[in-house]
Every structure is written in structure tokens, then in C-alpha cells.
Curated annotation (Swiss-Prot):
Belongs to the ATPase alpha/beta chains family. The gene is atpD. It is found in: Cell inner membrane. It comes from Laribacter hongkongensis (strain HLHK9). This is ATP synthase subunit beta. ATP binds at residues 148-155.
Amino acid sequence: MSQGKIVQIIGAVIDVEFPRDSIPRVYDALKVESTGLTLEVQQQLGDGVVRCIAMGSSDGLKRGLPVTNTGAAISVPVGTATLGRIMDVLGTPIDELGPVATEERMPIHRAAPKFDELSASSELLETGIKVIDLLCPFAKGGKVGLFGGAGVGKTVNMMELIRNIAIEHSGFSVFTGVGERTREGNDFYHEMKESNVLDKVALVYGQMNEPPGNRLRVALTGLTMAEKFRDEGRDVLLFVDNIYRYTLAGTEVSALLGRMPSAVGYQPTLAEEMGKFQERVASTKTGSITSIQAVYVPADDLTDPSPATTFAHLDATVVLSRDIASLGIYPAVDPLDSTSRQLDPLVVGDEHYSVARGVQMTLQKYKELRDIIAILGMDELSADDKLTVARARKIQRFLSQPFFVAEVFTGSPGKFVSLKDTIKGFKAILSGEYDHLPEQAFYMVGGIEEAVEKAASL
């Protein structure tokens, strides 16, 4: 355990000088003795100086303070003892319930699984959310991105997915809060407690008030815990909210580390950092990690380098649209922009595939006719087009659904709709079975039977 001393402090980036014969390796964890602060080595600058990122606030540090090299990477507690606990980037519990009861720890930097260990799956994961199950189905062991700008419902969608999957599938989950609001983390904890699924979820938080070092590494902390469950042969869910903040934390420290910025001011290593993280989120022959990641889209621009880099790694993309949210349709999923590799007749079957494509064709036709309607009015449309518009508006409303986690806002009880009922409902609307019902009957209901009941009371 070699000793060094601080020689320079620039915000979250700290230079430490060690004797030449005992320079720490890259990714080694160093400890500032007087404050207990952990530093992670990023670069060796020569002359015994290493450049580090602080895993906490650098307030109160000064030059000359002694620093000890731990000789290993940051390691965090893993295993079932982490379930029901809230931890920070170093795996230290922050829920005031005492230490995590496990001796087992794993380093947060690990190699991705080897190619011959990987396993692909086409088994579907039913979420109970109609628009997702129908148009962008999730694969067990796949990676899903929830894309959306500010305030279109990424976190609410994610909370609903966790609630549905944790209750209906009774698997283990790891929730990683990367640079999001502390209030949401608090709400989420109480939501899980009330739903009685807290004992199946490990929570790792590095919120937006934390220094960039915490936000940069907290995603890896959560991932390491999920990898342990996978290696024990379990099927685990990894939720990351928000993967954009992981990129952003890298951007914040990149310039301080002396790197030239690339497009839009992002770090030049953007693709590499994202790839390192995403390649570890993989399913092996032992167990699976199904990952659902919220992706903030800056200024609603999907071509921004950060969301654009994330796209390449995903099996399904759920795009949340401000236009749909403004119509009052929640979840505000864009049915024409959201995609999934699983939407293939060989995976989902012919009936599901044809209904999903029929829904998209009807909505696309309605989108094309909207300009004509805006200029000339509905009366100028042909009888066929009028029918298409009427069905499209019913479909649009039937894609909305009351959420369990939003009951406090909407006042209506949440609904879990099975895939079978979802396909049955949309198939009936497309075939014209419900042409006689008013479109309001389809808004914020679960299955199609509920829409029929609602129509009777209108």
C-alpha cells in the first residue's frame, strides 16, 4: 500500500504524486486519509503523478494531503443482501438501515462476457402495457431504450414497467438512478415499498446533485450487482434512469482530464465509454440480464451524439413523443417511431405481426390525411378515408392506458392487459367490429370489454 500526496485540485479532477517505483495502475482506488474520500485513477501523467476523479465532493481538500493506494479497483457488495437496500456509487448503504450484510464484493470494472458464453433469446417479456406489447415487444435478455425529451414520462413508464414485471414475473431487479432527481428516487423507494416488491429490488443512486465522478461510475456499480445475479443463474432486470446522464458525467470530467472535445462538446471517447458499459449488459448461458434504460433526448433531437450512440446497442426503442403527450394520451409512446427486433412473424407469430402492422398502417394513413383534414375538413374525404380516420382515432385512444404508479395523479385504477387481450382488442377495431362505438369509449381503458362497458355509460 503505497503513500502519495495531492499536488493539484481542479474541481472533481485531482492529481496525486507517488514514488516512482509504486505508481498506482489505471482504475485503482485511492483513499484520502483525512476525509475518507475515494479517488479513481484515470491517467498516469509521468514523474510519478496520476490524475484521478473524485468519487465525492472535493470540498476541504488541499495540496499535500496524504493519499493511500488501495491496490485494487473500487469494489461493491453483491448478492441477495443488496436487495431492498439503497446504496451509493461505492456500495455504501444510504438508507440508515446499517451495513449491507455480506462479505462478498466485486470490482466495478470487469471484462464483458466472452463471445462463446453469450446466449440469444427470442422469448418475449410481457409488460402489460398495450402499446409496448403490441408494437415494440421486449425480449427476455434484451436491451430496451425509453427515449424522450424533458417531461414526457420516461420515469413514470419505467416505474410502471418495474412494478408490472416485479409483481407479475417475480424476478430480481437492480435499479440504478444515474443523475436523476432525488425526489424521484425517494418516490420510487416508497412506491416499491407500498407495492411490496422492495425485497426484490436493489437500489443504487447517484443523483444529479452528486459530483460527476459518482454519476460516471454509479451505472457500473448497479451493473456489477446485476452481473452477480446473472452469474448465479438468475434472470435479472437492470433499470438505468438515465443513461444520458452517464454520458453527461463523462463530458463534465473529459475536458478536466485534458481531452479535446468532439461534436457538440461531448467527450471524444463517447462511443467507447458507451460500448464498454453496454457490452457488459449481456445474457450468458448461465443467466440473463434484461435491461431497460431511459434515454433523455436533449431538445427532442434524436440525432444528438448521445442518444444516437445509444441507439446502436438496443434491441427495442420506445420513443416518447411530446405531440402525443399534448393530446393527453399516456403512455405517450409514438407508435410509428418505436421499433423492436422482436416484431417479426417468426418470433411473435403471424396474428400478432399482422395486427401490429395493420395498426401502424392505419395510423400512418391518418397521419397523411391530417393535412387534408386541416385545410379542407372531414367532409372532403372519401367514405373509405373517413372510416380509416375514425378507426385510427379509436386506435390512438385505445393505445392509452391507466398506470398503477400514476393512480395518485389520475384517480383511476391501473390496468395490466395481457398480450392475448391486447391483440384481440386491436384486431376487433381494425376489422370494424366496434365502428359503432364513440371514440371516447376507448380512452384510458384496459381491455376491449372495458371500452364496450364505458360506451354503454356514455
